[in-house]
């Protein structure tokens, strides 16, 4: 019998396939980032067994704990997608593959300094507050280019793009 989590995952994959085909795209070119916060490590393992490899965590310690439990699963890619405070940069630098919420040079510098030399550079996205909402984190659009330039020279980071959260329509 198929579990609820398997059904949900397969339904999302089916929607991605349908949307990709409608847009004349190859569904295999669409990457799903499964947000695994609040799900147990064994549920993540179940979805990984279906082929999912990229998982996003909002909470650093919860993510670090899951990464440790699931280290026997090959090919998992871990994304830190939540806000990042400077006192949490070390475990992120040591355990995650991606950070989607870099909004200050200080955070980027700490991540670069704390990234172990035996690991590949940490992939990062700059979080940009595109609508100026005071409740949202992120660098302002006017300061984003300067931050990108400063981050792009840090030796243990690779700037991959931007992360934005628009106001709901």
How would you describe each model-predicted region?
Residues 1-169:
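Conserved alpha/beta-domain cores
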């Amino acid at each position: 019998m198929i579990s609820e989590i398997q059904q949900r995952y397969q339904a999302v994959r089916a929607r991605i396939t349908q949307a990709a085909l409608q847009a004349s795209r190859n569904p295999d070119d669409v990457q799903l980032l499964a947000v695994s916060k609040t799900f147990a490590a064994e549920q993540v393992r179940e979805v990984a067994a279906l082929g999912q490899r990229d998982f996003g965590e909002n909470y650093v310690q919860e993510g670090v704990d899951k990464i440790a439990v699931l280290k026997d699963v090959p090919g998992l890619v871990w994304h830190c997608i939540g806000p990042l405070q400077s006192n949490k940069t070390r475990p992120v630098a040591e355990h995650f593959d991606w950070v989607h919420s870099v909004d200050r040079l200080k955070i980027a510098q700490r991540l670069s300094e704390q990234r172990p030399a035996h690991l590949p550079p940490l992939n990062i996205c700059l979080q940009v507050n595109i609508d100026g909402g005071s409740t949202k984190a992120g660098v302002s659009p006017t300061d984003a280019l300067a931050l990108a330039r400063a981050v792009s020279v840090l030796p243990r980071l690779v700037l991959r793009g931007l992360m934005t959260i628009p106001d709901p329509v």
